[in-house]
Amino acid sequence: MDFNFSQDELDLRDGAREYLRDRCTPEVLRKLVEKNSADLGSWSEMIEMGLVGFLVPESAGGLGMCNTGFVLLAEEAGYVASPEPLIDVAGVAAPILALLGIDSAAEIAGGTSRVVTAHSLNPYVNQLQPTDKVLQFKDDAVSLSDASDIEVDAAESIDPLRRLSKIVSAKSIPIASGDEARHLAAKAASKGALFTAAELLGLAAAMIDMSKNYVVERKQFGVAIGTFQAVKHHLSTAFTKLEFARPVVYRAAATLSDDDEHAALHVAHAKIAAGDAAINAAEAAIQVHGGIGYTFEADLHLFMKRVWALTGLWGDRNYHINKVDRAVFDRRSKLGPATTFQSAGNAEGH
């Protein structure tokens, strides 16, 4: 298994980073909150850059890239707390529709259609627009609906930049049922959890960087508070948790791309690790910011609230811990030192 990123993936990551950090600044996010809006107005530009069609096959007008590369995009979107529904549309809906050979995947890549997602692990539709379509995973069926054929109730979010809708009823077109629908729902859940984990990595990195800059500028007793050992410990612990979580997420992306039998388990581990790292980063950031960290004056709250919203999305911590527990205690699972050393012995020809 190759854990290295391709040069194309790194180049696209760098382009997305430059664009997002210029386009989606804390000042821009604050203005959206003040206007009671969550529309960044960057969707068409993200389509032109190929970000929305990243996972759509080239034959359908996309870039034909894989999960490992999209993880990098999700991480960059998290770093700026982008309100755009990139994961739901480009990370989940587009590749699922492409698997089914449905034209909507090409329409997403081309920008003529936008399809958001509703799933039992992601029941609230984010940023639903009147011209959108909704890919709904419910019971043993997968269906596609126009937003105009759906009745929704508005739902509140702790994050002011997430505009949620709960589907009450829908006139939908079934596109899969039975075993196929269950298989697609599981794939969607894995993709959603993986890319949300990557977004949490980006949020954690942003809060650590914001805190690092603050403790260098903030002075007490004539010196920067970043020189105090207690402050160093808070941020070094947060940074260590982040760096230990990142390879877990990257490993999950690689195994999911390869359809590894343990991919769902690796995704569960990734969601746990990234969620823990992001929560720890938020707590450390508030601690080192002091009193201002609890106010709206600090940009920190925009990122912290996004973390709180995302940790429960596509399966909360308990959901994924239970999944890992079942795998660990399942005697059929190839886990533990016996498997590890047996594999090593086989590799050496023993």
Indicate where each model-derived feature is located:
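Alpha-helical interface subdomain recognition
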Residues: 1-80, 178, 187-350
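FAD-binding core of flavoproteins
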Residues: 81-91, 95-209, 213, 338-350
